[in-house]
Amino acid sequence: MQQDVIALKIDDKIIDLQTAEAQGIEGGEPVYFDNSPEALEVIRHSAAHLMAQAIKELYPEAKFYVGPTIENGFYYDLKTETPITDKDLKNIEKKMKALAKKKFDITRYEISMEEAREKFKNDELKQAVLDMIPGDTVSIYKQGDFEDLCRGPHVPNTKYLHNVKLQKVAGAYLGGDSKNEMLTRVYGTAFATKEALQEYLKMLEEAAKRDHRKLGTELELWMFDEEVGAGMPIWLPNGALLRGNLEKLLYSAHIRREYLPVRGPELLRSHMWKISGHYYNYKENMYFTEIENDDPEKPADEYGIKPMNCLAHVKIFGHKVRSYKELPLRLFEFGTVHRHEKSGVLHGLLRVREFTQDDAHIFCRPDQIEEEVIKVLEFVDSIMERFGFNYEMEISTRPEKSIGSDEIWEKATESLKKALNSLNREYGIDEGGGAFYGPKIDIKITDAIGRKWQCGTIQVDFNLPERFDITYVDENNERVRPVMIHRAIIGSFERFIAILTEHYAGEFPTFIAPIKAIFVPIAESHVEYAKKLQKELLEADINTEIFASNDSLNKRIRNAEKRRVGYVVIIGDEEVETGTVAIRDRKKREQYKMTKGEFVEMIKNLSEVKL
């Protein structure tokens, strides 16, 4: 069956059919009405307008600001005299579907900025939008009696907008500025087919069950306390054990790959951040303090709490004369950093103000970039395979504003491509998306329910070696500038643990699980046997618990299973007499018996994992 074309793709830009017709644009790649990323961009943008049209009919006094698409959906910022709440979404959605059935053509026309100012003279939100539009002409899209300022792209008719779902209502400051008034933000999503929408909603339902904030509380892994501060996680014993297991695993993996452990201070003088450029380009994301000078006649020194670990590593490289024979020099640190995030974007462990990165910096010659990146990619492979993640990569290339010669940028970018090609990796290209100081590879992982998460980055940097004037002595006894590769594979322990918690739904594999097993003695006389087993495992750095309260056996078993540990071990007379254990295996969903020695050996083997 022939699919409808809803837009065109020309030079990686999506142009709707209305614009193409008005501007006489021909050719291009057709965007069909399906669930491709390009089609969903158009469908969701149009669904935002359909939602606004529905709200306008239900709340005639409504005024609208902007309604962009976002990952997996769209939103519209607006204000009404009668507050809109989550309870109203069902009614708005019903109105949207009724409007979609009317099959309104979606048309586009242009007017001058002056005409637009006059047209929307009684709408302060539209005036705010006009303030952001450059040029003397604006475009307006119209469907039925509803019209709004917009650049597009849009579908040709509302008949393409039946599969919509409104999700939640939130608050948002006008223009994202907390000094401005608070608007209402309504979120939704849309798909080309009913099946795709239902599949997505099912995924959201599953995601809610796996929410790391919920599981973190249930499993007593971490907590937040407003008195302590927003975005500052507090690790409880189970969470600290989980994190410690992950840190030990990654630490030994770095050592085996010839990385050298280092440690930098939490505070660095602002002078350092000025040299690096962070003081001028990143200051709003940093925290600063002052420390009094030893000389009372001099003013206090300003210090910045580090938002990243790289400056101390640069200093470590530069603190003595380096030879080309020392390169590549790989330094790593599990460094805690602080970054100021607005309270509205904080989200459990996924977005915090204090976090610890698996940070490494590789100092090398330009001709070593490719080989070093290959080694990092192989390291990435070993980690992602161990945790059961698929992942994809994207190279971001030179932006308009950048430092370094064309030649070195070309060589560095080509080195990244060659490294990926040599390992037969597929990758995307984000043209102009690199940092001003070098190209990079972004690593996005896919979890058990199909969501994608940005984690690691491999970043080539020509900037900091130049700013801090670090060099090595080459084979001709000349001073040469090294290339610096920033590299974080999991990104941060906090974020990665949040993702792991949701990926495994709290059922962590034995090698990182905080508690490997829970012993449930049937009676008091069986507790001593459980304690001996616990002690034997503890001597191998394996943590277990004993549930020996006065609760009934069934309740203790249920409570143990709620902890989502891999093994619940029941101990009664028979087990004590025969030196065995009765195991409830969560992963296999089986019950079986083993000798005490077999069980201890099994747990040890499952816990001894290398990357």
From Swiss-Prot:
Q: Does the keyword RNA-binding apply?
A: yes
Pfam family of this protein, just one? tRNA_SAD
Q: Which GO terms describe its molecular function?
A: ATP binding; metal ion binding; threonine-tRNA ligase activity; tRNA binding
- Chain residue ranges for the region called Catalytic: 211-509
Name the EC number(s): 6.1.1.3
Where is it located? Cytoplasm
Summarize where Zn(2+) binds, as residue positions: C310, H361, H486
Disulfide bonds listed in the record? none
Q: Which GO terms describe its biological process?
A: threonyl-tRNA aminoacylation
EC class, as a word, reads ligase
| Cofactor note as given | Binds 1 zinc ion per subunit.
The cofactors required by this protein are: Zn(2+)
Catalysed reactions, as listed in the record: tRNA(Thr) + L-threonine + ATP = L-threonyl-tRNA(Thr) + AMP + diphosphate + H(+)
Q: Does the keyword tRNA-binding apply?
A: yes
Could you tell me what this protein does? Catalyzes the attachment of threonine to tRNA(Thr) in a two-step reaction: L-threonine is first activated by ATP to form Thr-AMP and then transferred to the acceptor end of tRNA(Thr). Also edits incorrectly charged L-seryl-tRNA(Thr).
The family this protein is said to belong to: Belongs to the class-II aminoacyl-tRNA synthetase family.
Stored NCBIfam families: thrS
Q: Which PANTHER family match?
A: THREONINE--TRNA LIGASE, CHLOROPLASTIC_MITOCHONDRIAL 2 (PTHR11451:SF44), THREONINE-TRNA LIGASE (PTHR11451)
Q: How does it assemble?
A: Homodimer.
Q: What is this protein called?
A: Threonine--tRNA ligase
Q: Which organism is it from?
A: Nautilia profundicola (strain ATCC BAA-1463 / DSM 18972 / AmH)
